[in-house]
Design a protein with these regions (language model features):
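Rossmann-like NAD(P)H-binding beta-loop-alpha module
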Residues: 45-80
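A conserved FAD-binding loop/helix module that cradles the flavin
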Residues: 72, 212-238
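Conserved beta-strand-loop-beta-strand element in the redox core of flavoprotein oxidoreductases
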Residues: 9, 124-157
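Cofactor-binding loop segments of dinucleotide-utilizing enzymes, especially the Rossmann-like FAD-
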Residues: 13, 65, 88-91, 211
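FAD-site-proximal beta/loop scaffold in flavoenzymes
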Residues: 26-57, 142-216
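Single conserved hydrophobic/aromatic residue that forms the stacking wall/gate
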Residues: 1-8, 13
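Rossmann-like dinucleotide-binding cores of NAD(P)H-dependent redox enzymes
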Residues: 73-120
Length: 239
């Protein structure tokens, strides 16, 4: 009889990619980095003869400044984008991406439009994205993350031509998992609260790790959580 289980947000349904909830996000050619990278890497979507070929834009904007954003923009560049841009609302110094990821992206010809934030995507008569409107930003006082808060510069809006936009602004924990386990303690961000020493949740026989606890981190950290939880579960089951 199984008396304990480990919960991770990759169990059945992936984490939900975040969007910015701005006009035009439903246009053809606007997608999450999760969808883009999954289709290219796992579904052979870069092959035009595949069942579900991915759009290979020539003017590609990737929104975000993390490692996944760098993966996305470098992939777009390798798939033939003539102009591949990172659009990030803070400065390069505040980017969460690893320095080597930024360096490699620049070496591949990626443009960095820092201190810019999209406010709207514009489409053509076929419903395909053709432009994005960007709000110029400046840095204010640090926010809760410790990084300086981006503040809009009044009246500073510019329009850029694009034919593909990849949104890479993080993910949110799958909300179905906490609902499936009544009694779990959940944070304001929707992550499961655990004892960090053994990854045990508020339910004594339920352990959790990875993004459902951390809110988005690396595979290495998720593997570490799993090992820690497995050891604790083994000890508990042995009595």
């Amino acid at each position: 009889e199984i008396c304990a289980c480990l919960v991770g947000s990759e169990m059945c349904i992936r984490d939900s990619p975040n969007f910015m909830n701005i006009p035009g996000e439903n246009l053809v050619g606007v997608m999450s980095s999760n969808e883009y990278l999954t289709r290219v890497n796992l579904m052979d979507a870069a092959n035009p003869d595949s069942d579900t070929p991915v759009l290979q834009g020539k003017k590609v904007a990737v929104i975000g400044g993390g490692n996944t954003a760098m993966d996305s923009v470098r992939t777009a560049r390798r798939l033939g984008a003539e102009r591949a841009m990172i659009v990030y609302r803070r400065s390069e110094e505040e980017m969460p991406a690893r320095l080597e990821e930024v360096k490699h992206a620049k070496e591949e010809g990626v443009e960095f439009m820092t201190l810019h934030n999209p406010v709207e995507y514009l489409g053509d008569e076929r419903g395909r994205v053709k432009q994005m409107r960007l709000q110029k930003m400046e840095l204010g006082e640090p926010d809760a993350s410790g990084r300086r808060r981006p503040v809009p510069v009044e009246g500073a809006i510019e329009t850029i031509d694009v034919d593909e936009v990849i949104v890479s602004v993080g993910v949110s924990p799958n909300p179905l998992i906490p609902r499936a386990f009544q009694g779990l303690e959940v944070s304001k961000k929707g992550t499961i609260v655990v004892n960090e020493e053994n990854m045990r949740s508020a339910l004594p026989d339920v352990y959790a790790g990875g993004d459902i606890v951390r809110g988005g981190a690396t595979v290495i950290l998720a593997m570490g959580d799993g090992r820690k939880a497995a050891a604790a579960m083994d000890e508990a089951l042995r009595g």
